[in-house]
Regions:
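Core of compact, soluble alpha-helical bundle domains
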Residues: 1-127
Length: 127
């Protein structure tokens, strides 16, 4: 039986597994691997802090993901398909690993974050 997301160790498992899928994905992997050239040793701990703060309000994250994604969008236009694939991979990963209130919350927050980014980034493309 799967357990709920309960602590940072769970966040690390979720995010590491999720980004392993992202890196291998035909739709969005190239954005991370070839365009952004993500340094995973640096990026993953930032994402652990981000999601730990999103779910458990730890205050450990103090970046601005919108600025990073707006810059990336200037390099390669991000599309609704990119965001939908990100959402799909995130949801699948949560569902594979966890079950419970925080797992549901993680999926809801991921969808909210993706939706806000889509609105801001895609509307920026139409200016």
């Amino acid at each position: 039986m799967k357990k709920d997301l309960e602590n940072r160790k769970d966040i690390e498992l979720l995010i590491t597994t999720f980004y392993d899928k992202v890196k291998a994905d035909d739709t969005i992997g190239y954005i991370f691997n070839e365009i952004a050239k993500v340094n995973w040793e640096k990026h993953l701990p930032i994402m652990f802090d981000f999601w730990e703060n999103v779910l458990f309000f730890t205050g450990g994250y103090n970046g601005n993901p919108m600025i990073v994604h707006q810059h990336l969008n200037r390099v390669v236009p991000l599309t609704q398909q990119h965001f939908k694939q990100w959402e799909k991979l995130f949801t699948e990963t949560v569902d594979e690993l966890f079950d419970g209130t925080n797992a549901i919350l993680a999926k809801q927050r991921a969808l909210s974050i993706s939706t806000v980014m889509q609105v801001k980034i895609i509307s920026q493309q139409n200016i």
